[in-house]
Swiss-Prot record:
Molecular function terms, GO-annotated: rRNA binding; structural constituent of ribosome
Subunit composition and interactions: Part of the 30S ribosomal subunit. Forms a bridge to the 50S subunit in the 70S ribosome, contacting the 23S rRNA.
Protein name, as recorded: Small ribosomal subunit protein uS15
PROSITE patterns, A to Z: RIBOSOMAL_S15 (PS00362)
Pfam families in the record: Ribosomal_S15 (PF00312)
Length: 89
């Protein structure tokens, strides 16, 4: 269910702009997407886990806000990021 430190570090390395970058919107969205995907797998087994579902909805909302911010600041990076993460169809 939880994302391990190694998985999180790998996501940071894959999406960082420069070495040591952990706070850019791209990295934050990628980390949230990883956590959201792990929770979605969790809900396949634990359908009645409503407490965690509330946390999932908060993460989705936070990711949406970060994506809106990124789209308003740099639409090229936004399009590249959603393609890499496979968020839009």
């Amino acid at each position: 269910m939880a994302v391990t430190t190694d998985q999180k570090s790998q996501v940071i390395l894959d999406y960082q702009r420069v070495a040591g970058d952990t706070g850019s919107p791209e990295v934050q969205v990628a980390i949230l997407t990883t956590r959201i995907n792990s929770l979605i797998d969790h809900f396949k087994e634990h359908v009645k886990d409503h407490h965690s579902r509330r946390g999932l909805l908060r993460m989705v909302s936070r990711r949406r806000k970060l994506l809106d911010y990124l789209k308003s600041r740099n639409s090229d990076n936004y399009r590249i990021l959603i393609e890499r993460l496979g968020l839009r169809k």
